[in-house]
Amino acid sequence: MFLQIRSFAIVTSAVFLNPLLIAISPLSSSARTFQVYKDDKLTGGRAIIGTGQNLPALSSSGVWAIGNFPKEEIEKYHNKQAAADQQSVADAAIAWTNQWSQSRCNVPKSLDFSQCRLAAVFDVDDTMLSSYVVDLNSPVPFVHNGKLLNNAIESCKTPVIEPVRKAYQAFRSWGIATFIVTGRSKNQRKSTLNCLESMGMSEWEGAHFKPHEYKCSASQWKYQVRQLLINDGWNIGPSIGDQVSDMSYGSFTRGFLMPNVRYFIK
């Protein structure tokens, strides 16, 4: 993974956020979804659906960190609320994509993506697979440790996020093409794809890993990949990820932001 900022961080105030954005604490008691980004130039005017703001907008500057006290709060959120929030976002993605695919192809049930060229884009880390336990067990909890994460990736010790697997499998059953777009490096490609396949998420039409030589931000690279897919004739509906950089600058129809209170990738 290419992490520009990875820190102890919980959104506690809208002071740090773009004033056009809706911000709530991710420790909310309900798991409702709503439009967390609206008419933002960073999203190409596309809506992003989530259960909260997560971390600062890409327009924020500098290192955003709240200090080293929130470990207990992060664990509390993970143990009591995260699963419900993940389920809500995934359910929203399934419901929206079902309606979008039917209207796009003008058919009520099963689709044939070879005719309609419908596609969904998925991030990997903390979207399809969870790195929470890796971060928790880091020498300094929730501070990124590249060696530990690489070992977990190589051994497939990153558990599946079940609601996203459900969405992935639903899209496949409807004939929607699935593409993997991840900041993981190319030398992690084989381990990652083998792990995803073992978790029941396979038959993707393409998998894109960030090249070592690419020096721009994750948001710029992922946008370029989506644009290449569009240029190849794919109609991208949902873009699903845990970072706004998974759905920045457009080239998708609707974004779905999985909850992540641990780190921020620009």
Describe the function of each predicted region.
Residues 2-7, 11-14, 19-122:
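Non-catalytic pre-domain segments flanking phosphatase-related domains
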Residues 33-34, 38-40, 53, 87, ...:
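C-terminal cap/substrate-recognition subdomain and adjoining C-terminal extension
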Residues 93-104, 128, 132, 171-175, ...:
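Sec/Tat-exported extracytoplasmic proteins
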Residues 95-98, 166-169, 194-197, 227:
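Surface-exposed alpha-helical segments enriched in charged/polar residues
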Residues 103-114, 169-170, 228-231, 247-248:
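Surface-exposed acidic, glycine-flexible loop patches that form ligand/cofactor-binding
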Residues 125-133, 246-247:
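Short acidic, Gly/Ser-rich segments with clustered Asp/Glu that frequently serve as metal-coordination loops
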Residues 150-179, 186-187:
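Short, acidic loop-to-helix structural element flanking the phosphoryl-transfer center
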